């Protein structure tokens, strides 16, 4: 993304600090010129709308920035990426971070969620009478 007058470029420039923080958390080397915004799109979910579970192939990191997130607009859900094992885990005596099957995040306006693109994720139904609005994007890390 080279056109500095385009909104996606300005948006990506503004969030670089957060992308760098994610790299540090994962223990990855961060080189600003090597992280590329490859795709960007917006989703408007009306009452009852949801996003089914999916992954983002051909990217390293994906993100969702919630522009509008009224109360009861749903939760962001991440599933265990070990798809083959999901139904084969033994019954849990104590739920822990190591045996968790899903993680949910209550969406709030202004949230920026950045996560590995291989993680299966979905967004639960919007139960609000107001629209839920999100700008999502994918990042590719050059070598």
Describe these PLM feature segments.
Residues 1-32, 50:
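Non-heme Fe(II)/2-oxoglutarate
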Residues 29-47:
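Hydrophobic beta-strand-centered segment that forms part of the acyl-chain substrate-binding groove
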Residues 36-40, 59-61, 131:
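A generic structural signal for short beta-strands and their flanking turns/coil linkers
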Residues 42-114, 141:
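Catalytic core of non-heme Fe(II) oxygenases with the double-stranded beta-helix
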Residues 51-54, 121-128:
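Short beta-strand His + acidic residue motifs that chelate non-heme Fe in jelly-roll/DSBH
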């Amino acid at each position: 993304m080279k056109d500095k007058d385009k909104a996606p470029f300005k948006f990506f420039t503004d969030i670089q600090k957060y992308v760098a923080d994610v790299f540090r958390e994962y223990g990855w080397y961060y080189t600003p010129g090597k992280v590329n915004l490859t795709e960007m799109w917006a989703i408007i979910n009306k009452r009852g709308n949801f996003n089914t579970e999916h992954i983002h192939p051909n990217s390293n990191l994906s993100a969702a920035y919630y522009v509008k997130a009224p109360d009861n607009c749903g939760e962001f859900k991440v599933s265990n990426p070990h798809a083959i094992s999901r139904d084969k885990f033994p019954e849990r005596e104590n739920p822990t971070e190591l045996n968790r099957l899903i993680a949910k995040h209550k969406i709030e306006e202004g949230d920026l969620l950045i996560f590995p693109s291989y993680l299966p994720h979905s967004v639960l139904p919007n139960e609000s009478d107001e629209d839920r609005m999100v700008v999502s994007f994918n990042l590719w890390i050059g070598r």
